Regions:
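Conserved small/polar residues in nucleotide/adenosyl-binding loops
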Residues: 317-323
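Aromatic-lined carbohydrate-recognition surfaces of secreted/lumenal glycan-active proteins
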Residues: 25-48, 95, 99-123, 194-198
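Flexible loop/turn segments at secondary-structure boundaries
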Residues: 2-6, 44-49, 74-80, 123-129, ...
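Aromatic/acidic polysaccharide-binding cleft in carbohydrate-active enzymes
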Residues: 119-264
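Substrate-binding cleft/loops of secretory-pathway carbohydrate-active enzymes
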Residues: 42-69, 122-138, 204
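Active-site cleft segment of glycoside hydrolase catalytic domains centered on the general acid/base Glu
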Residues: 1-35, 41-43, 47-55, 76-91, ...
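Generic, well-ordered alpha-helical scaffold segments in large soluble proteins
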Residues: 24-27, 31, 56, 60, ...
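Carbohydrate-binding surface patches
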Residues: 259-301, 307-310
Length: 325
């Protein structure tokens, strides 16, 4: 891959990597025709050669692989809740870019094949702003992976040395950020077929020396797994909006501003087999509540069955073992 933090990152140029991926995928499928393979996209949306890298890669292996593997971790500075909860817009921009790129390659090859996407790493987090170094460009020599720090402490996987596993910013805020991303995946289910939540256990539970307990994300993801089935239905929302100014977390993670971000985020799934229309709604406004009116005139004969709500008076609250029911 192309990340300068990766050992051997420039051993293969994008064409060389694409050729290797093509030949490897062919051999694997000759051994087992049921195997599906994925080829890696660029390591970050902030790389100066994104998305040119994956364009060159796909030109070599489009016919033999099944997925373009993507990954991204959205970051927002402490206290900027709207930037954290608006992170799904950058994911959708990422998805639209890669899907369009895949379709361009298909058109150039006159191929009927439609490449699918897989998110093999994703997440959202609060990160303190780091010192910026103007003029050095992306991935400059101030980055930690170019330096040796003899005083850097190693992570000890020892119960008596266990680090704090609580989420920065609180369980509820972490859950809302992740669910907003997952709803974006649901809206793009025609192309995004796999999404691996990298910090799975870390996101779904918290722990201390003596206890492990379910965090807010556990309940939200459980409901998505149960109810986000069938056919993804596009939603149209009329609500108040806000603007997100651009910001830089560090020399690498720099986000353009976004205008007219809807305060209400939504996705829907029609479970035809069980005769259910399931609607998922999230409020990005930490200062106001909203009344929701749903127009489902296309589903005559359906009736309201039930709703689940996750709510807290304090978005920054962090749970402990005593909170789990």
């Amino acid at each position: 891959m192309d990340g300068p933090w990766q050992i051997g990152s420039w051993d293969k140029d994008p064409r060389g990597y694409g050729v290797l991926a093509n030949e490897t995928s062919k051999v694997m499928k000759w051994i087992d025709p049921t195997i599906e393979t994925a080829v890696c996209a660029s390591s970050a949306i902030f790389m100066d050669h994104y998305p040119e890298w994956e364009e060159t890669v796909l030109e070599q292996c489009y016919d033999s692989v099944d997925y373009l593997s993507m990954h991204h971790y959205h970051s927002a500075p402490p206290g900027d809740i709207k930037a954290l909860l608006g992170g799904s817009l950058y994911y959708e921009e990422f998805i639209d870019t890669e899907a369009a790129l895949c379709d361009v390659i298909a058109a150039k090859r006159r191929s009927p094949k439609k490449m699918m996407l897989s998110f093999d790493e994703y997440g959202a987090m609060i990160r303190p702003n780091a010192e910026l170094h103007p003029g050095y460009g992306v991935y400059n020599m101030t980055r930690a992976h170019y330096r040796f720090d003899p005083d850097r402490k190693y992570v000890l996987h020892d119960p008596d040395q266990m680090p704090d596993r609580k989420h920065p910013g609180g369980d509820m805020l972490q859950m809302l950020a992740m669910v907003s991303i997952q709803m974006a995946f649901l809206r793009h289910a025609d192309r995004v077929k796999i999404a691996c939540m990298t910090g799975g256990l870390g996101a779904l539970c918290s722990s201390d020396h003596d206890h492990v307990w379910r965090s807010a994300s556990y309940y939200a993801l459980s409901q998505l797994m149960e109810y986000a089935k069938g056919t993804s239905m596009q939603t149209s929302v009329e609500c108040e909006t806000y603007d997100m100014p651009g910001y830089a977390i560090d020399d690498t993670s720099q986000y353009r501003g976004k205008e007219n971000v809807p305060y209400v985020d939504s996705a829907s799934a029609w479970d035809r087999e069980n005769g259910r229309l399931n609607l998922f709604v999230l409020n990005r406004n930490e200062e106001s509540e909203y009344s929701l009116t749903v127009d489902v005139r296309g589903f005559e004969g359906y009736r309201f069955v039930k709703q689940f709500e996750m709510y807290t008076d304090c978005l920054l609250y962090t749970s402990d073992a005593a909170d789990e029911p």
